Amino acid sequence: MPGFDNWPDTAKGGSSVVCFDLRSGSLKQRFAAPEGAQWGDMTLDAQGNPIVSDGQSGAIFQLRAGTWHRLDHGDFISPQTIALGRDGKTLIIPDYVRGLAVLEISTGEVSWISNSPTLPCALNGIDGVYAAGDRLFITQNGVDPERVVKLQLDKEGRSILGYTIIERATPILGEPTHGVRVGGDFYFIANSGWDALDRHGKIRPGARMTPPVLMRYSEKPKGTSPL
């Protein structure tokens, strides 16, 4: 990662997607990124193929049959953690600067999800998006205060009808980053520690690292709780 200097030079200069055997923990395969690519976040398509974003160049790549294929046409500035659309043919891409987009996997065509005219929600600073039918769970660490939000979409999945704040400005919430949907619950990293680091990956003067906290949000019954 550019700017981070707390690891050896031999570990710099390349990105890879690696596959491990979950039972043994052994490394099965490694797929090096194209030259110059800097992978940031990953999801899987309907066939289990990795799809990765490059937050530095704005590119979106898909791995098929051992070969990387670029999906986008240069629409993004800083794409983050992507979600697979409910049709399996589209991707929901959070751009840290521009907002939420829908990308057609087969063509690379992009359309931007429109905001609610009556209850608009800030869509910048989204670090990750996680789909659940007609709802999107987002972690936003590029807004002040940082927050975790549930968005309600229309039936086409192209417009936001409303939103619910899951966690914002609470003592337990630091800088939220990644999450995952399991059954009817949304689990997310509530305090990743990124806010305590400077641009070089070192602890900022006066900052203090705290133990990581995972949180769970349940829609039925509604509410969050630390794990």
List where the protein language model places each region:
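Beta-rich, blade/repeat-based domains predominating
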Residues: 1-3, 33-50, 75-98, 118-139, ...
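Short loop/turn segments immediately following the C-termini of beta-strands
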Residues: 2-5, 55-57, 95-96, 141-143, ...
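Structural signal for beta-propeller blades
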Residues: 7-8, 17, 58-61, 99-101, ...
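A short beta-strand motif characteristic of beta-propeller blades
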Residues: 26-32, 67-73, 109-121, 161-169
